[in-house]
Curated annotation (Swiss-Prot):
GO terms for biological process: carbohydrate metabolic process; glycerol-3-phosphate biosynthetic process; glycerol-3-phosphate catabolic process; glycerophospholipid metabolic process; phospholipid biosynthetic process. This is Glycerol-3-phosphate dehydrogenase [NAD(P)+]. It comes from the Bacteria. Keywords: Cytoplasm, Lipid biosynthesis, Lipid metabolism, NAD, NADP, Nucleotide-binding, Oxidoreductase, Phospholipid biosynthesis, Phospholipid metabolism. PROSITE patterns: NAD_G3PDH. The active site is at K195. Catalyzes the reduction of the glycolytic intermediate dihydroxyacetone phosphate (DHAP) to sn-glycerol 3-phosphate (G3P), the key precursor for phospholipid synthesis. Belongs to the NAD-dependent glycerol-3-phosphate dehydrogenase family. One of its GO terms (molecular function) is NAD binding. It catalyses: sn-glycerol 3-phosphate + NAD(+) = dihydroxyacetone phosphate + NADH + H(+); sn-glycerol 3-phosphate + NADP(+) = dihydroxyacetone phosphate + NADPH + H(+). NADPH binds at S17, W18, R37, K112, A144, R259, V283, E285. The keyword Isomerase does not apply.
Length: 341
């Protein structure tokens, strides 16, 4: 009986800013192990209670958080797995995990992106590689550095099984980090992937010096595009005005710490996308998601002008100026049911 009552051990896979922040939160609630590739990062976490590479020297992590570079140790001891690796490495880590992980261990993704080539959401990859393991996503307006510094924030844990979601939500909840639950995994994952593309669009606008009214226009119409595609793919319309949708869209479009907004600004400064990506310390998921989103839009017969223009700049040689001229040239129709910008 005592063994059944013990605190579940959370294993966070990934050493980036958000994975480390979530690992530190979980460590304040119970036993937590973080797997990282870099020995230097592991030593920094274990000895200095910091992840200086991704969170700087000022953010102090929970002193009960332990890091390891031993993947087998992490996989073999996990009661709950939290996936903090980028979308391009997600499947590979899961495949390695499948060799070691016990049955039924829940897998919670932190990734707000889609897999290029298959266009799959992260929970779909979990279901394919780790059948029988409950899969979900923790999503919301969460700039990692702010959460790590203790500013109040919130997220939503999306899982099909609400009893399990409620139980797991307590692992992530603190006095200043609120965690809600939902069963709309599709909506939460699509909102997380889409907002990155739209943040690039807003970043382009910053580089052009657009006004606040124009910025609000782009964000509002982006929410409409996000909702149209998300609902077409099976998401609930109630998800998109919430934390995973509008909340995350606002912070990713407006925060100076937003990687995707930064990409848009750099594109507006005339830098090639490859040069921008090479100069960044972390992944901007919107760069990879833009073409995938347009494939979905074409599949469902949807017109998505903002996503279209971002894809054109990133993948088809268009300029930021041409993108915004293209949006303004759109003829406005019905605000809800119209197909244009």
């Amino acid at each position: 009986m005592a063994a059944q009552m013990r605190e579940p051990k959370v294993v966070v896979l990934g050493g980036g800013s958000w994975g480390t922040t979530v690992a530190s939160i979980c460590a304040r609630r119970g036993p937590t192990l973080q797997w990282v590739r870099s020995r230097e990062t592991a030593d920094d976490i274990n000895e200095n209670h910091r992840n200086s590479r991704y969170l700087g020297n000022d953010v102090v992590l929970s002193d009960t958080l332990r890091a390891t570079t031993d993947f087998c140790e992490a996989a073999n001891t996990a009661d709950v797995v939290v996936m903090g690796v980028p979308s391009h490495g997600f499947r590979g880590v899961l495949t390695e995990l499948a060799r070691e992980l016990r049955p039924w261990v829940p897998v919670v993704s932190l990734v707000k992106g889609l897999e290029q080539g298959t266009n799959m959401r992260m929970s779909q990859i979990v279901e394919e590689v780790l059948p029988g393991h409950p899969a979900g996503i923790l999503a919301g307006p969460n700039i990692a550095r702010e959460v790590a510094e203790g500013y109040a924030a919130a997220a939503v844990l999306a899982m099909p099984d609400q009893h399990l979601a409620t139980r797991l939500s307590g692992l992530f909840r603190t006095r200043r980090f609120r965690v809600y639950t939902t069963d709309d995994v599709v909506g939460a994952e699509m909102a997380g992937a889409l907002k990155n593309v739209f943040a690039i669009a807003v970043g382009m606008g910053y580089s052009l010096g657009i006004g606040e009214n124009t910025r609000a226009l782009v964000i509002a119409r982006a929410l409409r595009e996000m909702t149209k595609l998300g609902v077409a793919m099976g998401g609930s319309p109630d998800t998109f005005p919430g934390l995973a949708g509008l909340g995350d869209l606002i912070v990713t479009c407006t925060s100076q710490r937003s990687r995707n907004r930064h990409v848009g600004e750099q594109l507006g400064a005339g830098k090639p996308i490859d040069e921008i990506i090479a100069s960044m310390n972390q992944v901007a998921e919107g760069v990879k998601a833009a073409s995938v989103i347009m494939e979905f839009a074409n599949e469902f017969g949807l017109t998505m002008p903002i996503a279209r223009e971002v894809d054109a700049v990133i993948n088809h040689g268009s300029t930021v100026e041409q993108a915004y001229r293209g949006l303004i040239a759109e003829v406005p129709g019905h605000e809800v049911h119209g197909s244009g910008f």
